[in-house]
Amino acid sequence: MRQISFFLLLLLGLSACSSQYNIDGNSSLACLDGKKLYLRVPKTKGKAANGVNIDSCVVVHGRFSFGGTIDSIALAEIYVGDQHLMPVVLEGGQLLLQVDNYAQTITGGPLNDRLSEFMTQRARFDNELWELDRTANRLLYNGKTMAQVMSLLEPRRHDLLQKIELLENTFILDNVNNVLGEGYFLMLTEQQPFPVMTKQFLTIIEQAPASFRRHPLIHRYLLAAGYVPAAAEKPQTAKTSDSVSQKK
């Protein structure tokens, strides 16, 4: 009887440490129908920094779903093959996803609400950049030279890129104490062809608390990029994207 009680308590304890999540998604993108989606979380152990697929599903008539348990809140990513589709916070409970041509939205839980608001703002800037590209192509088609198009549109493009960077920096620094800040910073690092400290990364790292830099994956990236904290004797040993381009 005591042995049964022990295993019952152990089972209850394990249940308390994990949470159940259910994701229901809708997509208006015809290109996703019939495609297999993968739910991927970061791999914090081992030398490889690749993500781990914890679930998969097929999009049928614009609908898809994931479900399972997770030990702790995590920022996961949904992939179509090797192509990133969107992030989602696995924070337990029922999560609803909407994917269309203009944005991706997530509802269900405070962190997902915060993430969805950020993604909506980011999508507005991305759409403006896309419109600039269309305008550039139209001007070139109508006989404008590349130099004329650049002179006309580059100031607006630069302004949009600055706004995107500020939005991303603010989002990360406002969420340094939860999975959103850590996870989105790591998503930005994945966009680099190799570990390097860009000006944006330096800005974030220098303003973030030490606990942020101690995150296993962030710490691993900083070491690979040659980052040295500002308080160290030789901070100039950190590699930056500008210095790499100058060497080339």
Residue ranges and their predicted role:
Residues M1-S27:
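Bacterial Sec-dependent N-terminal signal peptides
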Residues C17-D159, E165:
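A non-transmembrane, solvent-exposed segment enriched in polar/low-complexity residues
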Residues M119-R122, Q162, N175-N177, Y184:
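Charged heptad-repeat coiled-coil "stalk" segments of single-pass membrane proteins
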Residues R157-K163, F194-K199:
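Helix-turn-helix repeat elements of alpha-solenoid scaffolds
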Residues L166-I172:
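A short, acidic, amphipathic alpha-helical segment used as a generic capping/interface helix at domain edges
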Residues L173-K248:
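Charged, long alpha-helical assembly modules
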